[in-house]
Design a protein with these regions (language model features):
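Catalytic core of pol beta-like nucleotidyltransferases
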Residues: 1-46, 53-106
Length: 106
């Protein structure tokens, strides 16, 4: 019979720590707008929702590779959008996305 495992909260990174970690390790992020959204901003949830807005192509593939390394031990859920998609859906406003740069300064 499987039991419920307790979570060691001392090992969980804050949203600010996650933002700093991603900005420091994913150098290609300078080419994109990057945000966090979702329940982790409220201190609940079990993953970090990240929104990346920018061009597709080789730069995006490089960023995805950087995310694989940077997020190897993090529960990241990453959404990629072209700028026109973000504008048309008003995703940033509707989901109350917060820039990673702002979170990293907290």
């Amino acid at each position: 019979m499987a039991g419920i495992r307790s979570i060691d909260r001392s090992k969980i990174m804050t949203v600010s720590e996650v933002a700093r970690h991603l900005l420091n390790t994913c150098k290609s992020l300078v080419l994109y707008e990057s945000y966090m959204f979702g329940s982790s901003l409220s201190g609940i949830g079990c993953d970090y929702d990240i929104l990346i807005i920018g061009p597709s192509g080789d730069a995006l593939q490089k960023l995805k590779d950087e995310f694989k390394l940077a997020g190897a031990e993090l529960p990241l859920d990453i959404l990629y959008m072209l700028p026109i998609e973000a504008e048309e859906t008003l995703f940033v406003k509707e989901q109350k996305c917060v820039p990673l740069l702002l979170l990293a300064k907290q």
